[in-house]
Amino acid sequence: MTDKTILERSLGIFNLEKVDRDIFSWTGKNVGYKRIFGGQVMAQTLIAAYKTIDVEHYAHSFHSYFLRPGDMDKSITFTVDRIRDGKSFTTRTVKAIQNGEAIFNCSCLLYTSDAADEGLG
């Protein structure tokens, strides 16, 4: 496998497919590892949260829990719970589910550029 192929397959992990309003999916792709790297599922949950927001936001805080190991060969479903949509801050809880069980859970607080300009971020 060439370096270009490895890079293209690796970047594909960030392409989440919209299934429903607050549900996204990633189709498992083996890039040479059996288990999912924790940073991958963390990034994917943050991407899922961002996909539920219309205005540009920045991550302010991110609290997460690794619950079970993930399998690179199997798809992951990301469910987003819209906790709060405020003027400056937005809160989301995202669960990554594989084989019907949560493998990762996070709560993230995101803020707008206006909040950052006011020194709130």
Which stretches of residues belong to each language-model region?
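Conserved small/polar residues in nucleotide/adenosyl-binding loops
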Residues: 111-116
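N-terminal low-complexity segments that are often proline-rich with Ser/Thr-Pro
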Residues: 119-121
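Hydrophobic, proline/glycine-rich low-complexity stretches
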Residues: 1-75, 85
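Hydrophobic/aromatic-rich structural module bridging two neighboring secondary-structure elements via a short loop
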Residues: 70-110
